[in-house]
C-alpha cells in the first residue's frame, strides 16, 4: 500500500507544511541576526540540536520507504493527525519566536538587558519553541505512516533539545537569577503539567 504522503493531494499537503517549516526556520535565522548582542554562553548545543534534527529528518524520511514499518489500515487517520501536529508545531514555534522578540537568538545567549518573558506561549511552558519542534517532528513521523520513522523523528530531535534546554536554563539562571527561578518554579519545560 502506498502511504498517504506519496499520494496525489496528500503529498502536496505534507510537503507544503514540511517546506514551510524549514523556510520559516531560515527566514527566522536571517531575520534575527541583529539580536545577537553580548557573548554567547556556549555554542556546542546548537551543533547538537542541528545534528540531531538533521540526522532524525534524513533517517526518518529514509525509513519511511521501509515497508515493514507501515501503520497498516490506520494510515489515513494517522496521516491526518500527523499533518495537524506538523502545522501546530510550526505555528507554536513561530509564535514563541515572536513572543521573545529581540531576545530570540539561535545560540544560547542572554541579552544584556534581557528580562523574563512570560507572555504568549511562555505563559504555559518555559521552552515553547522547542515544544513546537517536538510536535512538528512527531507529526512528520506520524504523517510518514511508518513506526520506525516516528521513533527516530521523536527521539533524535528530542535528545538534542534536552541538551539545549539544560544549557539554556543554566545560562538563564546565571544571568537572570531569582527572576528566572521564580518563573521556572511555576511552569514546566515543554508540556504543561507533564515536563
Regions found by a protein language model. Give the residues of each.
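Membrane-interface loop-to-helix entry segments
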Residues: 118-134
Amino acid at each position: 500500500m502506498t502511504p498517504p504522503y506519496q499520494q496525489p493531494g496528500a503529498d502536496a499537503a505534507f510537503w507544503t507544511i514540511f517546506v514551510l517549516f524549514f523556510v520559516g526556520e531560515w527566514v527566522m535565522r536571517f531575520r534575527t541576526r541583529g539580536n545577537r548582542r553580548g557573548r554567547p554562553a556556549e555554542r556546542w548545543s546548537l551543533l547538537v540540536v542541528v545534528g540531531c534534527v538533521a540526522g532524525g529528518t534524513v533517517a526518518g524520511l529514509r525509513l519511511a520507504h521501509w515497508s515493514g514499518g507501515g501503520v497498516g489500515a490506520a494510515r489515513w487517520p494517522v496521516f491526518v493527525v500527523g499533518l495537524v501536529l506538523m502545522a501546530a508545531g510550526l505555528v507554536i514555534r513561530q509564535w514563541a519566536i515572536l513572543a521573545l522578540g529581540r531576545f530570540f537568538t539561535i545560540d544560547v545567549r542572554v541579552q544584556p538587558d534581557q528580562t523574563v518573558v512570560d507572555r504568549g506561549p511562555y505563559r504555559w511552558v518555559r521552552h515553547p519553541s522547542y515544544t513546537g519542534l517536538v510536535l512538528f517532528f512527531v507529526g512528520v513521523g506520524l504523517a510518514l505512516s511508518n513506526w520506525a520513522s516516528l521513533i527516530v523523528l521523536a527521539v533524535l530531535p528530542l535528545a538534542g533539545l534536552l541538551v539545549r534546554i539544560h544549557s539554556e536554563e543554566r545560562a538563564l539562571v546565571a544571568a537572570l537569577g531569582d527572576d528566572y527561578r521564580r518563573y521556572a518554579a511555576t511552569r514546566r519545560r515543554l508540556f504543561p503539567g507533564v515536563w
